[in-house]
Amino acid sequence: MPENAWSLIFDPKYAKKLKSCGISMLDSATDVIPAALHYLGKPAYSTNPADYTEATKLMRAIRPNIKIFSSGINDLAGGGLCMALGYSGDMNIAAKRAKEGKTGQTIEALVPSTGGLLFYDNMAIPADAEHPNNAHIFINYILRPEVAASISNKMNYATMTAAALPLVDKEITANKSIFLTDDAKKKMVAQGVTTNDMRRIMTRSFTQFKTGL
């Protein structure tokens, strides 16, 4: 097992060994390319086109080892894969399904030692919304402790509603890939803003990687 979990996918030395049992990758340029840049020690949301050239070169080297492009939930749970680059919630859902379905698969969501990409789900009300009061009612409903906790318990993601924490399953609050340690939080990379030009470069890089060109 490499010290940095990213190496399991981005280092051909490890990826080749996992090819036979299956590796999946998210079908998302805005997730995969920043992850590759971060692995290379570049800014995950770089504005330097040369960085994307390096990321493309890195990913071309591992392309033969990628079996499918998907979230990996069902394939992991069913034993069709042994490694997946995916969202922590999806990986933990796969682990839960494997356990409940008694598929014989032991799945663990790994937090890379160098950190990963951090994201938040947000709720917002458009300035010109026709029924802003209804939107406030819905948001207030989602923020109810019992509702926020049920979402965490179902989706395997952390809740930012402090009052909900006592209602979240202990198995989830103890899971360090869901509720990150303070040390892990410091290493996470928040989602950055990309210009249209950089987004086009990112998409082109991912397309070249996915098609093997």
Region locations from a protein language model:
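Solvent-exposed loop/turn segments at secondary-structure junctions
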Residues: A29-V32, G89-N92, T114-L117, E130, ...
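A ligand-binding cleft/hinge motif common to bilobed small-molecule-binding domains
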Residues: M83-G104
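Short, hydrophobic alpha-helical packing/hinge segments within bilobed ligand-binding/sensory domains
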Residues: G72-I73, L81, A135, A148
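Extracytoplasmic ligand-binding site segments that recognize negatively charged/polar headgroups
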Residues: M1-G80
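Periplasmic-binding protein-like
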Residues: Y52-A61, S70, T103-A127
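Conserved C-terminal helix/tail region of periplasmic/extracytoplasmic solute-binding proteins
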Residues: N74, D182-L213
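Mature extracytoplasmic/periplasmic domains
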Residues: P126-K187
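Sec-exported extracytoplasmic/periplasmic mature domains
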Residues: D11-A15, K19, L37-G41, P64, ...
